[in-house]
Design a protein with these regions (language model features):
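Active-site gating loops and adjacent loop-to-helix segments of metal-dependent hydrolytic enzymes
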Residues: 1-7
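Small/polar (Gly/Ser/Thr/Ala-rich) solvent-exposed segments
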Residues: 97
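His/Asp/Glu-enriched, well-ordered alpha-helical/loop segment
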Residues: 7-91
Length: 116
């Protein structure tokens, strides 16, 4: 990824599309033989580094509400609202300040139940 980050020019068209209003959904190939699950945070950081999203908040939206909207699921999920489906994590730290906070999960709630 470091080599790719060094060559930001190869992502110019994607960044231009994003700045023109094209919705960019975060996604990875995590779990495939070449991409481990622990690559999610570095991939989000890479999106921020490229300027593809507006900071950490933009990266989080890309993984949640924007992904739901692109997949036409935004009436059911993607944001925390009454009546929507939601799995929630409680973490140490603030991902708006540091995306690596997403790796410091203290509690997970799935369909309203604690997954301790």
């Amino acid at each position: 990824r470091q080599r790719q980050a060094a060559d930001k020019a190869k992502y110019n068209d994607l960044v231009k599309a994003s700045h023109a209003g094209v919705m960019i959904a975060f996604g990875t190939d995590a779990g495939s033989p070449c991409v481990q699950h622990n690559m999610i945070v570095p991939e989000m950081e890479f999106m921020v580094h490229l300027g593809l999203v507006d900071g950490n908040y933009g990266a989080l939206r890309s993984a949640t509400s924007i992904s739901a909207k692109i997949n036409k699921l935004d009436q059911k999920l993607g944001t925390l609202e009454k009546g929507k489906l939601a799995d929630v994590i409680v973490m140490e730290g603030n991902p708006l300040e540091d995306l690596s906070s997403l790796t410091k999960v203290k509690y997970t709630f799935k369909e309203g139940c604690s997954m301790l």
